[in-house]
Amino acid sequence: MMLPSYLHFAIRKKVLAIFIVLLIISAYLGFAPALPVPINDKVCHFFVFFLLTLVFYWVFDLSRRRATQLTILVCGVFGGLGSEFVQSFLTYRTFDLFDIVANLLGCSLALLLNILYHKRRLEKIRLQRYGHVPTIADDLEMQASAAEEEEEGEEDVSKSTP
């Protein structure tokens, strides 16, 4: 059976390994009865989901739109919301709406940074591949400079002829 074309993508193995290590550390921090270091719970939620989202976005070699959609689904919905619902079933952890807010803020900031960097990276690759492609504004500037050069040439000719 052939897979649809949108399911053909590469996995960046080194990034996946980093993500798995971060996920194991996050799971330990999220489901441990008490944190080993005294830290604000909301700050911890923010940074954990910021890092997870920052790394997960680059695990699969996808277009910017597909990477964004997959990251929102996995990190935002399953990670940010799902982990809090799982904690509500644990006897030593409690459900906290502000934890979800911190999770989603961390995801959102990392996703925004990833999107901006991805867009910039694609533009740089496009410029390297195709060079500078003139736009309408560039074309108008070239026409104006050509007209100025033509006028200067006519002035030079009129000055040289008596």
Curated annotation (Swiss-Prot):
Query: How does the record classify its membrane topology?
Result: Multi-pass membrane protein
Is this entry keyworded Transmembrane helix?
yes
Instruction: Give UniProt keywords alphabetically.
Output: Membrane, Transmembrane, Transmembrane helix
Q: Where in the cell is it found?
A: Membrane
Q: Could you name the Gene Ontology cellular component terms for this entry?
A: Golgi apparatus; membrane
Transmembrane stretches, start-end:
15-35, 43-63, 70-90, 97-117
Which PANTHER family has this protein been placed in? DOMAIN PROTEIN, PUTATIVE (AFU_ORTHOLOGUE AFUA_3G10980)-RELATED
How is this protein named in the record? Uncharacterized protein C11E3.10
Q: Which organism is it from?
A: Schizosaccharomyces pombe (strain 972 / ATCC 24843)
Read off the lineage from the record.
Eukaryota, Fungi, Dikarya, Ascomycota, Taphrinomycotina
